[in-house]
Amino acid sequence: MLMVISPAKTLDYETPPATPRFTQPEHLDHAQELIAQLRDFSPAQIAELMHLSDKLAGLNAARFGSWERPFNPSNAKQALLAFKGDVYTGLHAEDFSEDDFDFAQAHLRMLSGLYGVLRPLDLMQPYRLEMGTKLVNGRGKDLYAFWGERISAWLNQALAAQGDDVLLNLASNEYFGAVKRKALNARIIDTEFKDLKNGQYKIISFYAKKARGLMARYVIKERLTNPEGLKDFNYQGYRYSAEHSKADSLVFLRDQPLD
């Protein structure tokens, strides 16, 4: 079973990594192509393209300018440990054992507007480039056109490497939109996490994002390879709802946040 999650806007390059091990991203030539294009943008143009404040636009212009190969631990950090956001709060990889990192490396992928697909231990230099960015490029009008079917092909390679055909989608619609469902040699399992609010179960963004990370953590910690085991997920009060679920669309409900 292969999991995919979204990246995060917030990054942490200050905290020492929880493991000294690292790997190199497999698709840096494509990332470098985007970096070369983005370096031609002024901070004002970046602000307009990405809908950022002047301060954030300046920061990311500087990031694009300082991006360089080769990646090493002095200028980059493992992707799973560099991203900081609601998903990664739930995942909490800071306390992973080396065996946990091994399992994650085989079974978890992060989708990225700049890097395409990242493995957990892949070194990553800081960036901000959301998948939905309308960056006109040599392959089309946006990043979906830039990546085309390549992300799906790389996920197929990862599935084949583990001899499996199940993909657990824990990514947002924005990022999973870069995956061509029909091109995947996989059974795709989608998930929804709903919390009780005003008498109804609803998707609450903050909690749903964190729950995706919790589910990824659950799979890693339990070494799950059979999707049937997903139904036993019970972290922080969530429970599987057979009534609300379908075969490949699993719904988890929670009556009261425990965080």
UniProtKB/Swiss-Prot annotation:
It comes from the Bacteria. One of its GO terms (biological process) is response to hydroperoxide. InterPro entries: YaaA. GO terms for cellular component: cytosol. Belongs to the UPF0246 family. This is UPF0246 protein Pmen_1032. It comes from Ectopseudomonas mendocina (strain ymp). The lineage of its organism: Bacteria, Pseudomonadati, Pseudomonadota, Gammaproteobacteria, Pseudomonadales.
